[in-house]
Amino acid sequence: MSERILVNCALPYANGPLHLGHIAGAYLAADIFVRFNRLNGNEVLFVSGSDEYGTPITITAEKNKTSPQNVADIYHREHEQTFKNLDIVFDIFTRTTDPEHVKDVDEFFINLLNKNYLEKRYMVSPYCKSTGKFMPDRYIHGTCPYCGFNDARGDQCDECGRTLDPIELINPRCTSSNEEPLFIATEHFFLRLDLLSDELLNYLNTRENWKPNVINFTRSIINEGLRPRPITRDIDWGVPIPLNGFEGKRIYVWFEALIGYITGARVYSKNIKDDDYWKKFWLDKNVKSYYFIGKDNIPFHTIIWPAMLIAHGDYNLPYNVPANEYLRFEGAQFSKSRGIGYTVNEALSLVNKNYLRYYMASIMPETGDSSFSLNELVSRVNSELIDKYGNFIYRVLGFISNRKINIKKCEPDSIINEFKRFFDEYSESIKNIKIKNGLQIWLEAVTLANNYFNSEAPWNINDHERLNQVLFTSLKISMYLTAMLYPYVPSASSEILSSLGFKTVNYKFDDMLGFDDFRPLKGEPPFKKLEIADKKINIDLMVGTVKYVNDHPNADNLYVLGVHADRDITIVSNIKKYLTPENLQGRRILLIRNVKPATIRGIKSEAIIIAVQHGERIIIPEVNADDGSRMKIDGFDFNGDIISMDEIKRYKFIVDKNELVLEYNNSRFIITENGKPLKINAPDGSSIVL
C-alpha cells in the first residue's frame, strides 16, 4: 500500500556557494530517499528553499557593498542551479523573502500570540559602540560556556551544537570591531518553550525511529529545563512584526525560516493549480514527514520547530529528523563562510555528477563525522562503480551484442533469489535512512553478479538453451543492480536502463524488477576511468629544526641558518631584523622544501622559511612533528617536483581562526599536522612572508 510522505530539507543560507559539507549533511541523503520512495510508488512532496533573512546574508552584503536582497537574489539562483547540477531535484525550492512566506509567518505569530505562547519581555541585546547599532547574535563571538570552544557564535556553538544567547558567551567580542559589546535592555517577544516541555517530552517518547544521537541530544537539553526564547531582534533585515509599535524590530530568522517548510508546500500547490494539495501533507495525521538536516540544525528541528507546531495546533509533527554529522576535509570542518574545502561546483569541475554522488553517498556521515578525500574518491569510483559494476554491465551487453544473440524469456537461475534478498535488505536500509548501508548492500550484490558471470563462463557454453538462461539471468541481475543504483546515481542509471531495453519514463521498482523483454544494446562502456590531472598541489611543506644561526658574511640584513629537515640543509633568510639567533636556535619550523636552490650573496639556500607577519611583528610558527615530516594539504599530495619562486607565488598562505590556510585556484585548503589543523598563534588575516 502506497504512502504519502513529506520530505523537508534544511533551507541553506543564501550567502555563498554550497559546499560538499552541505550535500553530505542533508541534501544528497534526502534526494536518494525521495527517489527510492517514488520508485516504490509512494506519493512524495520534496521541499527546500533559500533562507534569505539570516545574519550571514547581511554580513555578505556589507562585505560586497550591496543590499541583502541582492545577495539573496544572486545565491538563490546559484543554489537552484547547483542542486540541478548534482541531480538533486526538489518539487519546490522556495524563498523566505517571498511575500507568501511573510503571510505564513504573520499567521503563525498571531496564532501563538493569541494562545499565550508568546509574551513580551525585556532582554539585554548586544550593542556595538563602534557601529552604533544593536548587533545580531552571529556578530558576537566568544567562548562557549558549555564546552569551552573559543570561537562560538552568539546564537550557537558549532562544536557542541548548543543554542546560545550572546550574553552567555565568555569574553564576548563584536566581529566587526573585536571590542566587547554593551548589553542593553530592550523589549522583545519570547516563545514560551517552558510551557511546552512536557508535551515535547511526550512527543519524543514516541520517536523510536530516531537516531540515538539525535534523540539523546534533544532529550538532554529538554531535561536541563527549557527557558523562554526571544524570537524578535533589533535588526533591519527580516520579517516585520505584524503589530503596531514594533516597527524597528524584526522576527528572528530561527523562528521564521522554519515556517518556510509550510510556505514551500503552499506555493507548490499554487504552482500546480491545486490550492489545497499542501493540506494533504500537513494536516493528514497519517502522513510521515521527514526533515533532512545537518548536525548543527538538530535543536531547531527537534525542539523549537516541534514546540512551534504543538503550540499552533494544526500541523503534523516531524516523523523523523535524520540529522547527519559533519563531513570534514582532512580533519577540518567544511565552511562556507571561511571558504574551506570544495564547493559543489568546484568538485563538479573535477568529477562528473555520477561519480560525485556515488562517492558522497559512500562516505555519508550518518552516525559520526567522515572525511572527504579526492584521492579516495578516485580510488573508490574506479574500483567499485567502474571496475565492478560498470564492467559487469559492459561484459554482459558486449557478449550478447558481439555474438548477435537474440535473448528469449525463460526461467532465470535460482541465484536470482539472492538478488531478491539483496533488494529486500537494501530497501529496509533506505526506509530506515541508512543510505550508506544501502550502497554497501548493493556493492555486495555487484560482487555476487561478477562471481556468477565468471563461474558460468558463457563463452564456454555450447548448449543454446543453457546459454540463453545464463544470459537472461545476467540481464535480470543487471536490472536489479541498476534499479538499486538508480536513487544514488540517477543519470547514469537511466542510460544503462535504456541500453537494457527498458524505455519506461516514470520508473517504478515493480516495473524494473519484473522486466523481461530485453533488447540489449552494447554501446560504449557505461563509465570511463576517472583521472584527475590537477589532484596534486606542487608544494612541499616540511618540518625542520634550526641547528645554528649565523650572520651572512656578505650581507648585513641576512641570516644563514643550518636546519635539519629530511637532511642537513642551509637556508638564507631575511628575518634578521625581526628575530635574534636565540629566538630561532632549536626551534622546529615549517619550510617550503621543494623550492629550486638559489645562491644568495655567495651562499646556497635550499628552502624557504614560513613566517607570519602581523603589522611590524614576525612570528615563526612552531610545529610538533619530527624533522622531515610533511604537512598535509587537504586532499592533495605533493608530486615531488622542484619549483621556482615564480611558481610559489601562485600559492597564498593566510591565517584564519588560528589555522594556516592555503589559497589556490579560487579554493582554500587547511594545512594539517597529524590529521589536525596546524594551529598558529597569530591574529586572523595575518599574511605569510617567505
Curated annotation (Swiss-Prot):
It is an enzyme of class 6 (ligase). A motif ('KMSKS' region) lies at residues 333-337. CDD domains: MetRS_core (cd00814), tRNA_bindingDomain (cd02153). A motif ('HIGH' region) lies at residues 12-22. It comes from the Archaea. Binds 1 zinc ion per subunit. Its EC number is 6.1.1.10. ATP binds at residue 336. Residues 535-632 form the tRNA-binding domain. It is found in: Cytoplasm. Keywords: Aminoacyl-tRNA synthetase, ATP-binding, Cytoplasm, Ligase, Metal-binding, Nucleotide-binding, Protein biosynthesis, RNA-binding, tRNA-binding, Zinc. GO terms for molecular function: ATP binding; metal ion binding; methionine-tRNA ligase activity; tRNA binding. Is required not only for elongation of protein synthesis but also for the initiation of all mRNA translation through initiator tRNA(fMet) aminoacylation. Belongs to the class-I aminoacyl-tRNA synthetase family. MetG type 1 subfamily. HAMAP family: Met_tRNA_synth_type1. This is Methionine--tRNA ligase. The gene is metG.
